[in-house]
Amino acid sequence: ESKILTNRNIIQRAKTIMPGLIYDENPYLVIDKDGKLVWVLDAYTVSNDYPYSQRVTIETNGEKREINYIRNSVKVLIDAYDGTTKFYITDRSDPIATAYRNIYPDIFMPKEEEIPADIQAHFVYPKLLYQVQAEVLARYHNVQPEVLCRGDDIWSIASKSVGKTSTKAGTEFEPYYTMVRTIDSEKAELGLVIPYSQFERQNIISYMVGTYSDNGEAKLKIYKFPTDSNILGPMQLDTQLEQTTNIAKEIENLNVNGTSITKNMSIIPIQNTLLYVVPIY
């Protein structure tokens, strides 16, 4: 039987069906227990009218908007072969998602139908939500009212260089997926990572990891280093690398005939240690 399939772009397909949600720009493909390919797309309910809450700016699909409320309350599963699209509400305490279900009962899967466990086992922490949390955490990680008012314990997302340190300004780390094994974890798992420095300083003082448990539960943890620790930040490490004779010579040999040097540093948590990995292109 022949079919004409339209709206084959994963995000546009979901947006056409349910335009009231915000969709992550990073859908991912998983394999279910029967060997079928299924796209997983994280969807969010948002608002900019939540009382007494910090506003942040998000950008999705080229559109910017201010919000002060965001929840990853919906997961969209799309069959990669025939395009069958299913919307699951995963956070039933979210009033916005509940309102959408009441208005559009035929779009969302019935309450009694859960996401298959073999699909849940492949969930990863949603990137857009993580980016918002990382930005807000830089100021609000300290919950002492007097410290918040003074603003003397503010973090900033760590910066790294993408070219030669002497000629390129640092750029903030973007959240990235990597295998992590934190000090309180028994095994390595896929997580989102972002490192922090004290405001206007370069040393690493903490990092945040977002993971999913095997039963589909999102976990977000912050790991702080002692205040007297002196852990090199990415920019400081880059400076050391360029002052190391052998490495500096190799980079100089590559930088000939107009060739540009690009680096993309990653920081990988391994128990109580941070491993810096610096590919050079």
Predicted regions and their residues:
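Mature hydrolase/peptidase catalytic cores and their serpin-fold inhibitory cores, especially
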Residues: 27-33, 37-70, 109, 141, ...
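Soluble extramembrane regions of membrane proteins in the secretory/endomembrane system
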Residues: 12, 66-121
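A short, surface-exposed beta-strand/turn
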Residues: 52-87, 206-217
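Beta-sheet entry/capping signal
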Residues: 37-40, 73-76, 84-86, 189-191, ...
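A conserved hydrophobic secondary-structure block that centers on an alpha-helix together
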Residues: 1-53, 71-73, 79-81
